[in-house]
Amino acid sequence: MNMNIFSGALPARNIRSPRNTDMLFFFVFIAITAFNLWKVPYGTITNDESLYLAIPYRFMQGDSILFHEWNPSQMSALLLLPPVKLYYTLVPSGEGIYLAFRYLYICFHSLTSIYMYIYIIRSTDELPGSYPAALTASAVYLIYSYSNIMALSYNSMSIGLMVLVCLTMRSLSGELWKLIFVGIAFSGAVLCCPYLVLCYMAFSFAVFFRLVLHRRIPKGEDLLAHAFSLKSWAVITGVCFCLASAFCIFAFVGKDISLLKEIIPRIMYNNEHPQRTFVELIKGLYGTFYRNNSFFKPVLLSSIVLCAVITADKKRCLHRALYLIAASSITLLYSATYLLMYRETNVMLLPFSILGFFAYLLCEKKDVKSFVLIYIPGAILCFCFYLSSNMGVGAISGVSAVSMIASIIFVFRLLGEMRAQFCHKKSFARYFSIFSGIISLSVILILFGGITYTRALKCFREDGVSGLTERVTCGSAKGLKTTPEKAADFELKYSELSPLREIGNGNVLYFSNEIWRYLEDPKRCASSSMWLSTGGTEQNLQTLSLQEKYWELFPEKFPDYVYIRADLAKDPVFMAAWGKYEYTLTDSDNCVILCMNK
C-alpha cells in the first residue's frame, strides 16, 4: 500500500483507476463476501426472521396495512412486498424463500459497502487518511450483520438506507439527482423506523438556522452550504411528500379511517412496548447501558473528564498522542464486557463511536461535514431505535454502524495529521505519536476481530456453526442448515400441516409463536398480528382477548381454523376461554386444530 495515504491532500483522481487501495479493497471485498455467502445457509428460521417475510406475505394476500396488521414494524414490509410478490410468482409454493432472501440481503449489504467505499473517497479525498478510512469502514460494515441475522429486516434496511443518505449528503455539491436519491432512501428508512421523522425535524431546523445566520458566515467557509441549502430542503421534502402521499393513497383510500382511533394505540403500545413518559425514557436510556455494562459508570465519568481536559487544553495538538491513548483505553474498557461476555455483533459497534468522538476533538482541522452529516444522524438513528425497540443497548449499539463510518474517518484523519506533524522530526514525540497510533489501530482491529469471530462461529438463536450439519429439505426453510434435531422437528411440523394446508380457502389463526406457518398456508391470516405473544395462562388469555377485539372491528377476519400448540392446549383455563365458540376439535401430538362454526 502506498504509505503516502496518511499524508496531506491528494490530487483528484478517477475513481476507477487501479490504485493500490482500490486493489486492496477489491481483495478484502471478495474475501468478506465469500465468507458471507458461506455463512448464508447456517441457522434455522427464528421468529424475527419469519416476521420479516410474513407481514409482506400477508399484504400480498390482500390484507390492509395499519388496519389488518397491528405489529409496529409493519410499514417496513412495503419495501419487501415487491420482491416477496415476485418470488411467489416464480415459486408459488414459497419453498426456499428464507434462503433466497438471505442472498438478497447479501446483495443489498455488499452494494452498500461498495457505495460506502467509493463515496468516502470521493467526499473526503482532500483529507488525510481518506483511503484507509474508506477501506476500513467498508470492511467493518461488510462483515457486520445486525444481531447476526442475515435478513432484510427493518433493522438492516434502516441502517443501509441511512448509510446511503448520510454518505450522499456528505458528497453533495448541489446535484439534483443526489437530492432525489436522498429523499427516496430517507423515506424508505422512515418506513423502517418511523421515529426517524426526528432526523428530518433536525435537518429542517439546521436549514432554518443556517438561513438566519448565513450572512455572518465568511464566504468560502460555509462547509454545509449545499447540504443545508433551501434547495436541498425543498427537493428532499418534495420527494418525501410525494412518497408519503402515495403511501396514504395506498393505505387509506377505501378504508374506514375512523377505525384508526381504536387501532393506532394498540399498534404503538402493547405488552412488549409499553407506553413510557419522557422522564422514564431518559432514565431507561441511562439504565440500559448501566445494567448491561459493569464498566459503564467509570467509562462515562472518564469520558466527561477527558472531554473537559481536551477542550480546556489550548496546546492539545502537542499532547494528542497522550489523549489518543487515553481515549483508546476508555474504548477498550467499555468494550471489555461485550468482548468477553456477550460476544454479540450488535454491542461491538458502539465503541467505534467513543473513539471516533475523541479523535474528532483532537483533529486540528476538523471534518465538520462528516460530523454533522454522518456522526450526528447516526446518533439520532440510535436514539430513534431506542424509542422503537425493547432491546435496549443491543438496539442502540446495533444501528451505530452509521456513526462508525464517521468515527473511522476521524481516527484516520487524526493519524494523518499526527504523521504530518512529526514526520520530519526524530524525537520522543514522534515515536510516542506512532505508539499512540498503533494503540488506536489495535482497538479498531480488536473490535473488527470480535465481530468477525462472532459472525464466524455463532448464529442467531443457535448454539454454534459447528453443530449445524443438517439441511432442511422442504417448505419455506428449505436449504437452511441447522441441527439434525431442529431440521427433523421442522419437517415433522411441516408434514403435520398438510391436511390444513390443502384446505385452500378461509381464514386461519396460528396460536403459536412459529410465524413461518403462515407462509406455508395459502389461507388468509386471522390474527391481529403475525407476532403473537404466547406464554403462561394470563398472557395467552390477554392475547386471545386482543384477538376478540380485532374480530369485533373486522368480523370478516374471524378464523375458520385455529391452530393451537399442544403445550397451550393442555391449559384447561385457556381452552375453556374458547368455550363461547362452536367448533370441531382435531388433535395430534404437536397441536390442536379447531374447525370453527361461524
Model-derived regions: residue spans:
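Perimembrane helix-loop-helix junctions
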Residues: 4-7, 171, 186, 199-244, ...
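Membrane-interface alpha helices of multi-pass inner-membrane proteins
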Residues: 166, 178-194, 200-205, 378-389
